């Protein structure tokens, strides 16, 4: 665990040992449940804070300040310069310069820094986007594409085995409507009222090939351009026509999970927590859309994935209990499913809501947005909020080339570091790339804040993988950028004093590495030169 440099976990273990000693003559059990390590609310209180004394006060019937002082006496001091107690009973801990040096030098020299932070490694299949091949991907699909790929990268970095998949809804009535719409254009007729009316239908009609295949290929190319790389595109049509669907229904029947009523076949989903049983085969003998969905999820499990993540739009909220029941049934409760319901995206130009796309006749397409503002701003903005919150996306802000634009702000931090090293070379100033950091030689408020900020990286990865949230890593990149810009304004990095210059350059070299790792994970470019360089 030490090599992973998860400081919250390391500090938690230190507190645990101190608590064992302090509580050895009491009846208190499950010591770890009382320990929570957080960041101090203000730098003047230290780096980390623990409220364990207040949690124990009720159990021990003692004053929390008295408990905190007693625990503090038993804490191993080797990682800390200062351990203090603050009202009403917080234990505040400040990292030592020696330990900061040790961690940052490890960060610089270790390619696996912050990797493999999870102990319970899983084989995970993440299914996302899964759009109908009937039209361009809209901006909502773009949000799921950004979240799905960034989350997959986080899970991989944390140590899980991850497979990314797009389920192609290439069967059913919508495909018939697509074919009829394209044929109508080709024959110079009016598109049926319930058909697809976007301008893109004319483009599809001009091409040779099957309409759904043409559209799917364009979706694949756009996702690749967007930095979303699927491992597989699974076909609903193959599930329906390849015999797999019938085999799954036979499996459920043998398990006693199907019954007939009103000439239809029903799945006993209430047995697994759904509010009502669901039809899988209609009275006319055709399967409902739910039947291939059950089959597809069984297919995932049969391939060895027992932890499934589905990223869906919020309009699928009623679907969650039934598909969760299906996964429990087909896996015999050996697999688990997490459904992430992403909320909608509202596009603005300043204060004006952008409502329609002329090209698609529907929601604004992802390609329209990328063409206008670029991949990096699109990805970053779509990742800025929790998936459970709706997102207001200002296209004008995303195009700005100043610090009001958050993606510019964070990329400029990376470019600023690169520019400093370019200037170092231009000025032919000395720097020893192999010399370890000694933070004590440059210890001021901004350098210490920056150093301690980048040391949070392993914890940020671990917590993002645990919560399945990406926006926390976006916030973290912004905090690093803010600390870097503050450091830059407070300190002359290319200082004439070679000793000070050495330490400041080593510190920002470490910052560059962490920002680069964050950018790779969230899927934005590591830009080395920008238009506003000093």
Curated annotation (Swiss-Prot):
Subunit structure: Monomer.
Principal location class: cytoplasm
Molecular function GO terms recorded: arginine-tRNA ligase activity; ATP binding
The entry's keywords: Aminoacyl-tRNA synthetase, ATP-binding, Cytoplasm, Ligase, Nucleotide-binding, Protein biosynthesis
Catalytic activity, EC: 6.1.1.19
Family note: Belongs to the class-I aminoacyl-tRNA synthetase family.
Catalytic activity: tRNA(Arg) + L-arginine + ATP = L-arginyl-tRNA(Arg) + AMP + diphosphate
GO cellular component assignments: cytoplasm
SUPFAM superfamilies to which the protein is assigned, alphabetical: Anticodon-binding domain of a subclass of class I aminoacyl-tRNA synthetases, Arginyl-tRNA synthetase (ArgRS), N-terminal 'additional' domain, Nucleotidylyl transferase
Subcellular location: Cytoplasm
Motif ('HIGH' region): 131-141
Family annotation (InterPro entries): aa-tRNA-synth_I_CS (IPR001412), Arg-tRNA-ligase (IPR001278), Arg-tRNA-synth_N (IPR005148), Arg-tRNA-synth_N_sf (IPR036695), ArgRS_core (IPR035684), DALR_anticod-bd (IPR008909), Rossmann-like_a/b/a_fold (IPR014729), tRNAsynth_Ia_anticodon-bd (IPR009080)
Name the record gives this protein: Arginine--tRNA ligase
Residues in coiled coil: none
Organism field: Brachyspira hyodysenteriae (strain ATCC 49526 / WA1)
Biological processes annotated in GO: arginyl-tRNA aminoacylation
């Amino acid at each position: 665990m030490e090599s992973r440099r998860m400081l919250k976990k390391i500090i938690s273990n230190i507190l645990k040992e101190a608590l064992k000693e302090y509580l050895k003559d009491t009846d208190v059990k499950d010591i770890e449940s009382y320990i929570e390590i957080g960041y101090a609310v203000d730098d003047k209180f230290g780096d980390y804070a623990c409220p364990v004394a207040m949690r124990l006060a009720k159990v021990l019937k003692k004053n929390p300040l008295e408990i905190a002082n007693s625990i503090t006496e038993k804490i191993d001091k080797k990682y800390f310069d200062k351990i203090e107690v603050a009202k009403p009973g917080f234990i505040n801990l400040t990292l030592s310069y020696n330990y900061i040096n040790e961690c940052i030098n490890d960060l610089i020299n270790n390619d696996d820094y912050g990797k493999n932070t999870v102990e319970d490694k899983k084989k995970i299949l993440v299914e996302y986007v899964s759009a109908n091949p009937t039209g361009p991907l809209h901006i909502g699909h773009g949000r799921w594409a950004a979240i799905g790929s960034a989350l997959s990268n986080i899970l991989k970095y944390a140590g899980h085995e991850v497979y990314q998949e797009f389920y192609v809804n290439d069967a059913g009535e919508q495909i018939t409507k697509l074919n009829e719409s394209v044929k109508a254009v080709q024959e110079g007729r009016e598109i049926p009222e319930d058909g697809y009316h976007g301008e893109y239908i004319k483009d599809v009609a001009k091409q040779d090939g099957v309409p759904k295949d043409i559209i799917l290929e364009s979706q694949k190319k756009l996702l690749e351009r967007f930095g979303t790389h699927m491992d597989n595109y699974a076909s609903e049509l193959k599930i329906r026509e390849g015999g797999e669907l019938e085999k799954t229904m036979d499996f459920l029947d043998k398990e006693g999970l199907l019954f007939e009523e009103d000439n239809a076949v029903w799945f006993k989903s209430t047995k697994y927590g759904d509010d009502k049983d669901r039809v899988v085969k209609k009275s006319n003998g055709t399967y409902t859309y739910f039947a291939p969905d059950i089959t597809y999820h069984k297919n995932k499990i049969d391939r060895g994935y027992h932890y499934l993540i589905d990223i869906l739009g919020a309009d699928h909220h009623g679907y969650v209990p039934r598909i969760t029941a299906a996964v429990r049934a087909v896996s015999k409760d050996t697999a688990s499913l997490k459904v992430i319901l992403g909320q909608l995206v509202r596009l603005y130009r300043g204060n004006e809501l952008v409502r329609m796309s002329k090209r698609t006749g529907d929601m604004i397409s992802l390609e329209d947005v990328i063409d206008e503002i670029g991949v990096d701003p699109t990805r970053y903005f779509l990742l800025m909020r929790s998936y459970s919150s709706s997102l207001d996306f200002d296209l004008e802000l995303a195009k700005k080339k100043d610090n009001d634009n958050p993606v510019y702000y964070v990329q400029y931090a990376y470019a600023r570091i690169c520019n400093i090293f370019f200037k170092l070379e231009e000025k032919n100033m000395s720097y020893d790339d192999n010399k370890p950091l000694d933070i004590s030689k440059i210890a001021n408020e901004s350098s210490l804040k920056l150093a301690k900020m980048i040391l949070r990286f392993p914890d940020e990865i671990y917590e993002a993988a645990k919560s399945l949230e990406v926006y926390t890593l976006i916030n973290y990149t912004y905090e690093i950028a803010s600390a870097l810009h503050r450091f830059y304004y407070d300190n002359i990095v290319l200082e004439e004093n070679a000793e000070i210059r050495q330490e400041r350059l080593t510190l920002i070299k470490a910052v560059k590495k962490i920002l680069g790792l964050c950018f790779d994970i969230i899927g934005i470019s590591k830009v080395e030169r920008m238009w506003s360089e000093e």
